[in-house]
Amino acid sequence: MSVINSFTQHTINLTRKALRLGSDFVHPVHDDTPDEPDYLSNADVPVETNIALPHSDDWDDGHLTVTDIDPATGLLTTSTEGNPPLDEGTSIYDLYADRAERMGDEPLYTYKSGNDWVTVTANEFLADVRAVAKGLIHYGLKKGDAVAFMCRTSYDWDLTDAAIMACGGVLATIYDTDSAEQIRNIVNNSDARLLIVQDTDMRKKADGAVEECPSLEHIITIETGGLDEIKAYGTTVSDEELHERIDSVKKTDLCSIVYTSGSTAAPKGVEMTHEHYCQTALNLPAYMPDLLHDKRNTILLFLPQAHSFARAINYIVVSSNVRIYIATGIKTLISDLQVAKPTLMIVVPRVLEKVYNAASQKAGHGPKGVVFASAVVAAQNYMKEVSANGKAGALTRTRRAAFDPIVYSSLREVLGGRAKWIVAGGAPLDPELLAFFRGAGVPVYEGYGLTETTAPCAFNPLGTPFHAGSVGIAFPGFSLRIAEDGEIQVKGRAVFPRYHKNDEATELSFTEDGWYATGDLGRIDNDGFLYITGRKKDLIITAGGKNVSPGPIEEVIQRCEFVSQALVLGDKRPFISALVTLDEKSLRPWLAAKGLDENMSLEDAARNAAVRAEVQQWVNQANEGVSRAESVRKFIILPEEFTQENGLMTASMKVIRPKVIKRYSTLLNTQMYTKRK
């Protein structure tokens, strides 16, 4: 064995020991699949569900995804086969009942209560659901009645949601960060009879919002024993009455009105039926049985479940054999990861950015910082070669392997050490960041979806060859096409039917032949992989008529070590500009390393010449990838970040561009775009 091969094999052995890899995930250091450790063997045989589905073995994998020109429209279209239509009586309650029948005494949810982690089996959860559902019936909740729900991601969220679904109610989602005005708008738009909030702080906010809500009859606070009170009332409701209600629910019944984050005076409520969520939930386990039928696999939920993405993932995992851990919050995410050790994770790019920044900050600017920077380049170069050639060269593989025991393995351990499939969605992920994580052995895959598509409508299945910048193929049961103007359009059984009480918005959202127009721009390659290139509403048209997509430019500027956010502007303006915010935690050590006052205020840092020069370097790099007309000619560094608290970011961590422009309109008009004299 050569010295290179011996060194590489030694690194492989260290990597396998650290990752405990299973057969689902081949580590990129080597080409041949390792012998599978006992810990993650496929000893568990896929379990047949009681909801009628074709087993994945019946599918012809070579024909699952078809990409072709639609002869009727001439548009490039790609489709992935999904499950056949569900029975008329299928409901979300069936997902939980089926899990209990298959794995009743095995863990379903594990969550933190005080200082202790509590595990609830599928049978115990179903009993909880039935008890709360009976209580809701006692409260007078009729089939089709709306319940507005304001709660953080928690066991209480899943329990309350499932109970409302069981008795045929309609859950109207409220983010835990929503304002009193937004609460009022959602309660009134949904005609909610009941408002359930998680804690006393939310109750105070709700009390100040509901005076003008004529439909509302009750407000219940979970923190002060609200769910126990509901259960107590439910003891007067018979099993027969509950069963009658459960059996009355059909797949076409409305089950939820999901309000898009950032709703204001005119909220857009997306109507979802039981069929939408059940189709999504049942399609993925059938498509990826090796991952989702292994009982030893786990997932950690921490994204807001008021968002359709996180909620759909919960239903998907309930329909599988995977165990669910619920994080106590973003602040405790790292410690929660060490408990859950998830094999599956659903994240937004902002989370991965934070993980990367924390690792970079910990490495510092000395020798460790040099090693980390070299490891980043090695991982990215590795994935670039894999993307271009299907395989990295021997020297590139060896360089990458050298950093595995000293850098990459630590990064994987931060994420729990067992990750097989991490899906990033909700916003574009910087391709350089994706290449780093994939090259480091962190299996990050991009996906794409919207509230209107019950979240995922495109995804990269486990083991998908690396397609840099692609959000994957059509999700099972979906068809995607690209319109003449580049807009992505979607069709499938999980696409929403309408916006609640908003016929005008509904009509504008669908084409004449029934495809949902997403508002996103993209392209589909010959293999059926979708690439997002921008958003129609974000598309900047300068005063000179140049069309500019801000996303790629923003991604490069945000690679600056201490930049938190970059917002590229210039619509109907003479040139392209950018607003830049600072990540204070990353900024302090950078200032110290440069011999500057690390305790200077953010206002001073925003004006500091060295800080501006560093940002300018990244602006210059971004400009190298675009034409002169698309180049950022001027930028302003702001002394505050765009956050949910100041109303400039949604709960799903997307910057609200119109609100930023409005907030800084004076700054833009007097300093960025000064009129010529």
Name these PLM-found stretches:
Residues 565-568, 574, 616-677:
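Conserved C-terminal "lid"/linker of ANL adenylate-forming enzymes
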